[in-house]
Swiss-Prot record:
It comes from Escherichia coli (strain 55989 / EAEC). Pfam families: Transgly. This is Biosynthetic peptidoglycan transglycosylase. It is a single-pass membrane protein. The chain crosses the membrane at residues 19-39. InterPro entries: Glyco_trans_51, Lysozyme-like_dom_sf, PBP_transglycosylase, Pep_trsgly.
Length: 242
């Protein structure tokens, strides 16, 4: 290898190491800060806003209103757990059984990819990382998930998740969603309304709360059944999530 190539390789290596240190400090500081402080915006919100500007859409505003868990209907927390991650109170950030099922499904159906992200993983991804699929992003997501599971309580993870989840075009967080679609605060959401909001979470830009498709309605009904099977509101109290 020539001297010039060695110099370039050395420069790139030093740059990447320094970048990793900077990112580790940034993300570590964010995990510590947001364990107690409200989250003003997420990486997904920034990505959506910048993308809109780049496409010349200056009317788009990624909007979110932070609310604490006691300002959110307990039905909402139960609905997203029923829909997205029923083992949320038990695991340490990863649902191994669901991951194995998703991998087996994806091997058989390459054109219909199924995910297995827990609420903790989704929170880490939405808060700190860019959208998309890559092994690098998945690796970073795993590290950040372990970080928030170590530092935050389950109640804090759920609170942040509900405040940064995307519920529609420019609608982030359950308070903004409740006001936009039901003209009420998140604390007043009914069981059915909470299930409808949770039903669009797999793809909130495709599935609409304002005009739910037959699939969304069937998913809403399934979520309501799962909420009942989990035990209703006592489930949240039992796991200290309310």
């Amino acid at each position: 290898m020539s001297k010039s190539r060695l110099t370039v390789f050395s420069f790139v290596r030093r740059f990447l190491l320094r970048l990793m240190v900077v990112l580790a400090v940034f993300w570590g500081g964010g995990i510590a800060l947001f364990s107690v402080a409200p989250v003003p915006f997420s990486a997904v919100m920034v990505e959506r806003q910048v993308s809109a500007w780049l496409y010349g859409n200056f009317r788009y505003v990624a909007h979110s209103d932070w609310v604490s868990m006691d300002q959110i209907s307990p039905w909402m927390g139960l609905a997203v757990i029923a829909a997205e991650d029923q083992k949320f109170p038990e695991h340490w950030g990863f649902d191994v059984a669901s991951i194995e099922k998703a991998l087996a499904h994806n091997e058989r159906n390459e054109n219909r990819i199924r995910g297995a992200s827990t609420i903790s993983q989704q929170t880490a991804k939405n808060l700190f990382l860019w959208d998309g699929r890559s092994w690098v992003r998945k690796g970073l997501e795993a590290g950040l998930t372990l970080g928030i599971e170590t530092v935050w309580s389950k109640k804090r993870i759920l609170t942040v998740y509900l405040n940064i989840a995307e519920f529609g075009d420019g609608v982030f967080g359950v308070e903004a969603a409740a006001q936009r679609y039901f003209h009420k605060p998140a604390s007043k959401l009914t069981r059915s309304e909470a299930a409808l909001l949770a039903a669009v979470l797999p793809n909130p830009l495709r599935f609409k709360v304002s005009s739910p498709s037959g699939y969304v309605r069937s998913r809403q009904a399934w979520i309501l059944r799962q909420m009942y099977q989990l035990g209703g509101e006592p489930f949240m109290q039992q796991h200290q999530l309310d």
